[in-house]
Amino acid sequence: MSSTKWTDEQRQAVFTKNCNLLVAAGAGAGKTAVLVQRIIEKILDKEEPIDIDKLLVVTFTNAAAAEMRERIGDAISKGLDENPESKALRKQLTLLNKSNIMTIHSFCLQIIKNNFHTIEIDPNFRICDETEGILMKQEAMDELFDELYEIENKDFINLVESYASRKDTRLQEVVLELHRFAKSAPFPYDWLLNMAEEFNVGEEFNFEETLWADMIMEDMKVLLHGFKNMLQQSIDVILNSEGIDYYYEPFKMDLNFINSLLEKSSFKEFRGEIIAYDFPKLPLKRNKDADKEAKERVKKLRDRVKKKILEIKNILNSYENEFIKKEFIFLYPSMKALSNLVILFDKKYEAKKRERDLIDFNDIEHLCLSILTDKDSEDHIIPSDTALDYRKKFTEVLIDEYQDSNLVQEVIMSMVSRVKGYWSFYNGQLMFNEEEINLEEPHIGLDIPNRFMVGDVKQSIYRFRQAKPEIFLDKYNEYSEEESIKNRKVKLFKNFRSREEVINGVNYLFKQIMSKTIGELDYTEEEALKVGASYGEEVKGEPIELCLMDKKYEISEEVLKEYNMDEEEALDNIQLEGRLVAKKIQKLVGNNLEGGLKVFDKKLGEYRNLQYRDIVILMRATSNWAPVFVEELAKEGIPVFADTNSGYFNTTEIKTIISLLQIIDNPLQDIPLLSVLRSPIASFTDDELIDIRMVNKNIAFYECMEIIYKLYKDEELDSYYSFYMEDEDKTNKIVKDIKEELKNKICSFIEKLNLWRKKSIHIDIDEFIWFLYVETGYYGYVGALPAGEQRQANLRILFQRAKQYEKTSYKGLFNFINFINKLKFSSGDMGSAKILGENENVVRIMSIHKSKGLEFPVVILSGTGKNFNMMDLNKNILFHRDLGYGPDYVDTERRIAYPSLVKNIIKNKIRLETLSEEMRILYVALTRAREKLIITGLINNMDKTVEDWLNLSDDKNKVPEYAVMSGKTYLDWIGPALIKHKDAVSLREELKITSGLSNIVDDKSKWKIELWNKKELLKEKVEENEVEISEKIKETLMNLGESNYKEEIYKKLSFKYKYDNASSIPTKLSVSDVKKQFILDEKENTEELFKKVELRKPMFMGEEKKISPSERGTIIHLFMQHLDLKKAENEEDIKEQINRLIEREFITYEQSKIINPYKILKFCRSELGKRMINSNNINREMPFSIEVPAVEIYRELDKDIYKDEKLIIQGIIDCYFEEEEGLVLLDYKTDYVNDIEEIKNRYEIQIKYYEEALNRITGKNVKDKYLYLFSVDNYIKID
């Protein structure tokens, strides 16, 4: 076994044989390492080695599969180093390329390609693009609806009238959603028909004996447990308070009633007892010694219970069997019609795919399933001959991320694994039956179980993709930890990622809030994470921080006046939370001198200062919040990048180009036309557009332009225009009065547009788009704007989308525009192009889903006060994979519509499942942190909210399930759990809350709870605007008449600061600014610093764009930042790395020509390059800020007056690396060199500040400083 020190549980997971093994691995437990080690041990086993191609390893992503292959390859290579003569190891290395380590979809695709003849598909099939599939679906849908309207299909018409509202699109959306949903079932047609048949009830129907009735009762029992806690709490207060003991009996009767209900197993008895119960009246006794506060408190609690029980009673009263039966009978025809409509749609869509030899992503699993399954005489689903061959082939089947499996994948894996049993339908549900099946040929080794499944159900967060965590949970509850049994489980809950402080906090929180009801698992001490990581004693861990801000914090008029703000500006909540986070980050990072957080660097094996790249801000959804946070962090000088899936189609450059394509396809579209006309592509002014529109207000804008064009060119107008012109003479006069310049502009635009329209017909769309970029100069134009690199990358993405489109079965500009429109909605927007590498020193903002599997030294979870998304519950038909359809009851004749009983049941079930998913998402978020965890959130009303939290905190061990069920935000869960923690005492004191102090939980977790208010954060916003406001006042005064006070006010506003010289000095300078200042100081003659600017046409608008020296330097620096020194042995290696940067869109092909592979290779082979390669600690592109005396930079300042003035110098160090005696500083230069001494003098001061920054930041000595000069392929040492 490897040199890694494995725990006993990990060893069991690696070595256990001859059983189905489920490994439940908590966050940070090293499950991937265990899975890889198990594979390595099997192929390197000295007694019974298994060839690696006899193992099937199913991963969740292609990246995971590649990483696994690499690790296994490294292990085999290491074995060969120790035993070079080993034929067995060489064989495994050769077989590694043929190994079956892949995603489930890759495995299914492999099966389809090897067995295409059994399912009658063309062997040259292609997987269609997602958007191409959407276009085909829309075609199929439109054709199907037209056909059904034409034959006047009665059931279809009724369905349309009931659920389509005024547009067919609403019903079409229902069909598409149900189609997607059904495809998550192994046998979609069976599922659709079975779910419709659930409404086909006979006279013998008895609702009280159905699954739905049991579900209603179980859901209500969760609430009853909450009522029981309230009543028990009240009784405790009664018994411990003065003078209210006469309340004991009625409260005890209520409690007995609740206990009786909780014991009921029959819905009929349960319903009957609730309906029959009347709450006894409370005695009307007066006792002057009675504790009035306690009396009022218990009365309020009982009133809450009574109100809720009355609501339940009213619901149950409506559950009359006959009424429910009539509802089912009425809905059956519609639901059957809906199932049939989806099946007809699927068949039409399938036909379209077959015409084009296409399959879509969903087909991959279903076609594979059809190859691997067969049916016996009893209609049981059993393995086919092909599946049996795979069972013989694979000695073991290993499944990673098992908690995210869906039912289709589970059936597929069961077919190729050596399991005894079959699948069959029971009450409409597909179930696995673990029994012996009769096969024509006995399967050798079938009695030896061979499945290895690893995952963490607490991290199952893909229910929206139809993942079914119940598959994992069923086995987790069924399998045993005992040895020598066929179905065994091993628990890996030791966390090797996080500090003890993070783990203790996570454990405390989820013990309080996660349960089988919400989370689908009881988070007990047994499930809790155990500390496995060691961070030493050098730096102590910090408590988890919870930062709360009151949304409804009242800001007085005086405060608003003081800050010169209006109320709307003052109450931008997302902005304020972003500002709060910015303050936290500034404090964490410090000023790179002291005060910042220290984090442990695994690569260095020591502590270092926190950098921006160590911080991630996690959000449930980033679309609306991330842009605001980016803006707030950027204002504070914090480098930040938001990894979002939205915003791409809303960027100016993309909207402009899409508008241009739309008018090339059809210019009679006013909105896109005006968008293009106002853009730099056409550069029309608003006044010019008004002049054009005045020609005629009743026709399209382009037609107005055509009238001007034709009249100006003396061309005859079409009769169409004459018809719309109320007064032809008046129109002629309007056109005549239009300026000559505008007429020429219109003519030029129309002629260009006509040329573009003709060209679009004859070339591919991707070529045409690039032609437009160049022809209009727009690509160059956006590159010159702020964030130009990002804008150009976005345009390149559109070009790539066009290339992708050209590979589909659709052609032409019109279809491409449809393609893009569908892409907007199907992919939920794409997010802007990614231009940052993994090592960029920026704070990252990402969704919790994207963070899964990752870890970060510091995690900030924001937006915890944001409501969960429950919008799907408002649809007129709901779908559930087990419960089927939940439609509204719609009677078009009587004009009645309301949620059906089954819809209410399904709605509640989906709500609970959604809450369970949110619970697991919260778990994923909090377990990403290695060293520091911060949670931020907004609260509606702090005092009331905290009081509500206290009312839910009587049970020290658990927040009541009914309270968790009613939660609408993460804070609704976190708050009640923390308010009873010992570290929340300060919060209670600050809010002057004295109740509930007897329920303090003395847990070992450490928390720091902070209250923020808007006033604190608003103050700084105002200071930024003060100068601007002052200038506005002065401008107003200039326009006023004479006033006694005008002169005095103006004098004060024009006040000259005593230290005016210092006030003009910036507080922050770049190192380049400092260098320029020193060069200026050293010049004896007084040159003009500011010369007259000559305006000329930008280079990018000319025929050929030349790359400037500064851009050349930027490109070289970018490449050196990303250069992998270990993979730069020859020019081909370097060219490959250049191509990788082009593929990742870091540079363009044109820019890549600047990089000379030979010169890069010369650097790598130089003595300096070799030293750098041999270093174990290389740092590149490191930003810094240091404080220096102002007089050091600005020598004209009086040293006595300005001795205490400080400046912040900022810069980015190209590279430094560590050797035994100290650090080596390296700066790349692309200047053309004539005089070495001149270069040294030019950059001496710059290197000096780099050295000082490194000394201060690292605390280490800089032993050598070098400039590497690419123009002469040599380096010089700076003394």
UniProtKB/Swiss-Prot annotation:
Domain UvrD-like helicase ATP-binding: residue ranges: 4-499
GO terms for biological process, alphabetical: double-strand break repair via homologous recombination
Annotated positions binding ATP: 25-32
Cofactor(s) in the UniProt record: Mg(2+)
UniProt-listed InterPro entries: AddA (IPR014152), DNA_helicase_UvrD-like_C (IPR014017), DNA_helicase_UvrD/REP (IPR000212), P-loop_NTPase (IPR027417), PDDEXK-like_dom_sf (IPR011604), PDDEXK_AddAB-type (IPR038726), Restrct_endonuc-II-like (IPR011335), UvrD-like_ATP-bd (IPR014016)
Occurrences of domain UvrD-like helicase C-terminal (ranges): 526-853
Pfam families linked to this entry: PDDEXK_1, UvrD-helicase, UvrD_C
Transmembrane segments: none
Keywords of the record: ATP-binding, DNA damage, DNA repair, DNA-binding, Exonuclease, Helicase, Hydrolase, Isomerase, Nuclease, Nucleotide-binding
Organism superkingdom: Bacteria
Family: Belongs to the helicase family. AddA subfamily.
Subunit annotation: Heterodimer of AddA and AddB/RexB.
Reported function: The heterodimer acts as both an ATP-dependent DNA helicase and an ATP-dependent, dual-direction single-stranded exonuclease. Recognizes the chi site generating a DNA molecule suitable for the initiation of homologous recombination. The AddA nuclease domain is required for chi fragment generation; this subunit has the helicase and 3' -> 5' nuclease activities.
Name the record gives this protein: ATP-dependent helicase/nuclease subunit A
Lineage: Bacteria, Bacillati, Bacillota, Clostridia, Eubacteriales
